[in-house]
Amino acid sequence: MAGSAVPPALLRDLAAVLGGNHVLTGDATAGYVTDWTSRYRGTTPAVLRPERTEQVAAVLALLSGAGIPVVPQGGNTGLVGGGVPLHGEVVLSLARLTGLGPVDQDSGQVTAGAGVTLAAAAAADPGLDVGVLIASRDSATVGGAVATNAGGLRVLRYGPMRAQLRGVQAVLSDGTVIEHLGGLVKDNTGYDYPSLLAGSEGTLAVVTAARLQLVPRPRDPVTVLVAAGDGLEEVHGLARSAVRTVPGLLSAEFLTQPGLDVLIAHAGLVPPLPAPAPAYLILEAAGRGALDDLAGLIGDRPVAVAEAAADRARLWAYRERMPEAAGFLGPP
């Protein structure tokens, strides 16, 4: 359904719900109509910025009644245009839903508003972490991660966002609020709303809060970047072996030399190893014996090893900054 102008009377009704400062039009919408890479750009008649679930419900009821399409938007860190109003939709920004409850020490769970960043949720308890770790964690939001079923760098260990969910609160297009934040691990009382909404990209409902199962923060992680002289086939074999033989494996991510060349040329990174290779594998493991386990797997292949946090961050930059390569290459 193509977007259309929002009638002035409806804009006034929306402003009555949200406050005039949180109904943006004209030039004030510029930051909401393009994705992080600038490869996708749209237009919108208005950006709505609710702060509470009841406001989300009220504005969706108004827009649904007027037949006006909506695109929900979280931190706008996506790379494929999913949160961009490509057809002139109204943008519903969830960035102001930033409530973050205390961590339940018995269950290790926390309830976070859709606008809470993944980094903020991960910092809720010094001994616990969010299982989904992505490069944009300082800007990416809980609601967006649920809507996209984000995977991240530790998906091998902890699964995607769906696996972290113990409950959701969401609003249907007509303004009906779904409350399912109880946090029971085994709950057969009805539809599994967390699983249904994870990955639904805003097509079923707008997620306004999520109850997350936190995971123990990894102890003594070790990161290695290994050169694969035989390319992706060797990377695949190494990754499969790592899953079988490294008990503390947290991550296995690959990158290729062409992508690395773009980063070296445009982002100021230096080559990770003295000689180039067709492909590379980054592995991270934690716990007792992690370094020995990784060493046994790698053998005599060229490798960079990092144990200190700053050194590990430098190695991960080669993977985490890889989406920048798409931006450097310009529109498709």
Role assignments for model-derived ranges:
Residues 26-33, 216, 225-229, 234-332:
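C-terminal substrate-recognition/cap domain of FAD-linked oxidoreductases
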Residues 9-21, 58-66, 124, 237-248, ...:
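Generic non-transmembrane alpha-helical segments
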Residues 1-5, 28-34, 42, 48-54, ...:
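Feature of Fe-S/electron-transfer and energy-metabolism proteins
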Residues 99-106, 110-253:
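FAD-binding subdomain of flavoenzyme oxidoreductases
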Residues 73-77:
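Glycine-rich beta-strand-to-loop/alpha-helix junction loops that act as flexible
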Residues 1-61, 65, 78-108, 257-270, ...:
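N-terminal flexible segment immediately upstream of the FAD-binding catalytic core
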Residues 71-72, 132:
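Short hydrophobic alpha-helical runs that function as membrane-insertion/retention elements
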